[in-house]
């Protein structure tokens, strides 16, 4: 399993208004953003969650996250390779919330539903972005528009805009909760505290959170904490106990337990690996 933080950093580092890349065994925590995101499974299989739906996708399948969708990728105990495309529609002359006048009938599409023209446009984008042929920026602009047209032409969709139900499962509420957690995960965060802050019943919040993120609150927070800790272990000489407390763990024991569960090894083992690589 490729660790979540590594995927998160590599995607953000290479991404501006457009980004396309290949990821092996990606596991990426539930998140949301205003950009359009498409994941095409080249090989193997993985779990993908989008809003309240979670499916296991295989080679040839496609997943689409439109602006504001909460989504995650999970390759735990699986092997997968995906092409991940993220772009700002407005950068290409489209509405920021494209598709703005239609709604895709689903977020997941099986291999037989993915037309060859969609695959061709996607691989052409990957080639132009990787090899930087002459005038590749213009070709990328043209191919993004071609891909969007192919998605609308060949995937089932219907007129209308995306609507959120006025309930605790409201994605806008969960977006706010996720943003708060990401900005404050090193502090003490409990279900009761979140329910008071966002004025929602704790049972309903917990149920909606699990449904959308695929994890309970504690595991989600610990994943963020361990991700930051891994970065600090690999890039600083801070004592591990200091890192544990800085990332929000209240004891070295709880840090060791969470780190081993999520990465498969202890923090000290991670540091030893880093030291050995630096000495080579």
Positions of predicted regions on the chain:
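Alpha-helical structural segments
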Residues: 176, 224-228, 277
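A hydrophobic/aromatic-rich effector-binding and dimerization subdomain
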Residues: 1-22, 65-134, 148-160
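Generic protein-terminus/edge-of-domain signal
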Residues: 1-58, 62, 75-77, 101, ...
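Short, Lys/Arg-enriched, Trp-marked, Pro/Gly-tolerant hinge/linker segments that flank
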Residues: 105-116, 129-140, 148-183, 187, ...
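Basic/polar phosphate-binding segments, predominantly the helix-turn-helix DNA-binding elements
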Residues: 182, 188-226, 238, 244-273
């Amino acid at each position: 399993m490729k660790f979540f933080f590594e995927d998160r950093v590599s995607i953000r580092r290479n991404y501006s208004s457009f980004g396309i890349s290949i990821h092996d065994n990606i596991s990426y925590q539930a998140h949301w953003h205003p950009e359009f995101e498409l994941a095409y499974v080249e090989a193997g299989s993985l779990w993908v969650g989008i809003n309240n739906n979670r499916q296991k996708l295989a080679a040839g399948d496609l997943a689409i996250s439109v602006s504001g969708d909460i989504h995650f990728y999970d390759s735990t105990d699986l092997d997968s390779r995906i092409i991940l495309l993220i772009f700002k529609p407005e950068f290409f002359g489209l509405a920021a919330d494209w598709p703005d006048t239609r709604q895709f009938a689903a977020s997941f599409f099986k291999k037989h539903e993915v037309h060859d023209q969609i695959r061709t446009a996607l691989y052409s984008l990957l080639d132009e972005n990787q090899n930087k042929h002459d005038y590749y920026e213009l070709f990328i602009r043209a191919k993004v528009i071609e891909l969007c047209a192919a998605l609308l032409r060949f995937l089932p969709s219907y007129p209308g805009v995306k609507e959120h139900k006025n309930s605790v499962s409201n994605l806008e509420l969960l977006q706010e909760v996720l943003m708060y957690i990401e900005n404050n995960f090193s502090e003490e965060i409990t279900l009761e505290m979140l329910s008071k802050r966002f004025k929602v019943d704790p049972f309903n919040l917990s149920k909606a959170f699990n449904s959308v993120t695929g994890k309970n609150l504690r595991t989600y927070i610990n994943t963020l904490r361990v991700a930051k800790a891994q970065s600090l272990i690999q890039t600083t000489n801070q004592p591990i106990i200091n890192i544990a407390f800085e990332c929000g763990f209240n004891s070295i024991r709880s840090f060791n337990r969470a780190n081993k569960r999520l990465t498969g090894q202890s923090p000290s083992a991670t540091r030893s690996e880093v030291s050995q690589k630096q000495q080579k």
